[in-house]
């Protein structure tokens, strides 16, 4: 305990706000998904919260809230929220009286929230009540944290959110396959050199050699000594390649998790992002969408343009890092064979219409409508991607390989 330090007030304020923007909507969603026996575990956790044992009491409180986030079965969201530093925080402005009151609030919360008649609005109200009984609502929050805690250092890197056991080289060759499938590289085109690929993907020469070797074995590229790497004159179609189902399924899973995170959190995030937007910036967003429409460009798509705009405008560094990671992960779409080429034109038009509607609201100074429309647009996109993945039989593959209910059961 003597290793513990005071948090940095600036980093802490930033992360508390980020935690609210992520946890609040995810808790609400997790609660709304709970049915019948799902409630047994949270009930058991509250029952063993002893106000006389401070450390254990707060440990159980953290497990209680983690359960509802895990109930959403989104591993990316669970990892991100878990990495914000609250797990290791030791609460100081804490009395037995406060613990008794907080436990009472939790008992009331569980009793009310598990009623079948409990609506989304009821859940939000209940969450707000519990929040006011918790130490997080006490200002200033007195606590100590480990020396390397994000509550001291802030969050800049997203390394820990992206670690998966997937081979690095598969990421490189799937990306190249995707770029060929969307026409970025055509037959006979020269690909970047190994040195350039290493820089582009942040990998070693061993990784790029392995990736190019795989593409060569499949007849996708040819290498000419002293000249470089070229796309073959007759590269096979993506559906004829012996791609590992497990690998493609892992990308589908992460891609879906990214968009679900947007669908769940975008309303709160967009509302805060919009607060500092100048009329000129709002107009510029509208113009960017208009130019995309006029030139008939497909990349970046309208939803990605809105996401880029949010990343620029989010006032909290940690939240900005989260959305920047989601933006980076959008490139995954080209690693999933058939996903880009199977776009439904009518649905793409509807997505674009919704993006323009959101931008119009912002240009008109209505930040609440902007936030609402942005969230609805990402929810629509998320549903559209689920349908596409289902049509391509990817959902079945993901379910066969990953039992996401293990996150909470």
Which residue stretches match the model-derived regions?
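C-terminal all-alpha effector/ligand-binding and dimerization domain
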Residues: 96-158, 162-163, 336-409
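Helix-turn-helix/homeodomain-like alpha-helical modules used for DNA recognition
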Residues: 6-54, 124-135, 249-289, 370-372, ...
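Short linear motifs at protein or domain termini
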Residues: 1-21, 151-260
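Short helix-adjacent coil turns
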Residues: 34-37, 49-56, 73-75, 104-126, ...
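General nucleic-acid-binding
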Residues: 10-14, 43-47, 61-65, 70-82, ...
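Short, structured motif recognition centered on aromatic/hydrophobic residues
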Residues: 15-26, 61-72, 76-92, 176, ...
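Flexible internal linker/loop segments at domain or repeat junctions
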Residues: 237, 241-254, 284-288, 321, ...
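Conserved amphipathic alpha-helical segments that form helical-bundle/coiled-coil interaction surfaces
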Residues: 37-91, 125-137, 279-336, 373, ...
């Amino acid at each position: 305990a003597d290793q513990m330090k005071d948090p940095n007030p600036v980093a802490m304020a930033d992360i508390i706000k980020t935690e609210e923007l992520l946890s609040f909507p995810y808790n609400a969603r997790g609660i709304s998904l709970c049915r019948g026996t799902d409630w047994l575990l949270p009930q058991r956790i509250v029952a063993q919260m002893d106000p006389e044992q401070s450390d254990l009491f707060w440990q159980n409180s953290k497990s209680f809230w983690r359960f509802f986030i895990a109930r959403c079965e989104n591993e990316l969201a669970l990892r991100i929220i878990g990495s914000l530093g609250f797990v290791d925080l030791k609460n100081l402005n804490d009395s037995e009286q406060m613990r008794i009151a907080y436990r009472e609030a939790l008992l009331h919360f569980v009793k009310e929230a598990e009623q079948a008649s409990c609506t989304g609005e009821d859940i939000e109200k209940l969450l707000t009540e519990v929040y006011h009984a918790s130490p997080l609502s006490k200002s200033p929050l007195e606590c100590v944290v480990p020396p390397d805690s994000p509550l001291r250092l802030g969050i800049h890197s997203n390394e820990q959110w992206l670690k998966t056991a997937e081979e690095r080289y598969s990421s490189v060759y799937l990306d190249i396959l995707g770029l060929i499938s969307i026409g970025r590289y055509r037959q006979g085109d020269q690909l970047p050199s190994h040195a350039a690929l290493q820089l582009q993907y942040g990998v070693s020469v061993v990784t790029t050699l392995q990736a190019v070797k795989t593409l060569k074995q499949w007849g996708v590229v040819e290498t000419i000594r002293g000249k470089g790497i070229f796309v073959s004159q007759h590269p096979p179609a993506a559906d004829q390649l012996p791609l590992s189902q497990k690998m493609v399924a892992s990308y589908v899973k992460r891609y879906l998790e990214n968009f679900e995170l947007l669908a769940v959190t975008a309303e709160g995030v967009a509302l805060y992002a919009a607060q500092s937007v100048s009329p000129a910036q709002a107009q510029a967003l509208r113009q960017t969408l208009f130019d995309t429409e006029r030139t008939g460009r497909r990349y970046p798509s309208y939803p990605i343009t809105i996401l880029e705009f949010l990343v620029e405008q989010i006032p909290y560094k940690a939240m900005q890092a989260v959305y920047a990671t989601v933006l980076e992960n959008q490139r995954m779409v080209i690693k999933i064979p058939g996903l880009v080429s199977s776009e439904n034109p009518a649905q793409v038009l509807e997505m674009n219409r919704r993006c323009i509607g959101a931008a119009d609201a912002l240009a008109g100074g209505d930040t609440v409508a902007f936030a609402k429309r942005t969230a609805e647009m990402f929810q629509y996109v998320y549903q559209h991607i689920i349908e596409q993945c289902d049509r391509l039989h990817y959902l079945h593959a993901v379910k066969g390989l990953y039992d996401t209910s293990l996150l909470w059961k």
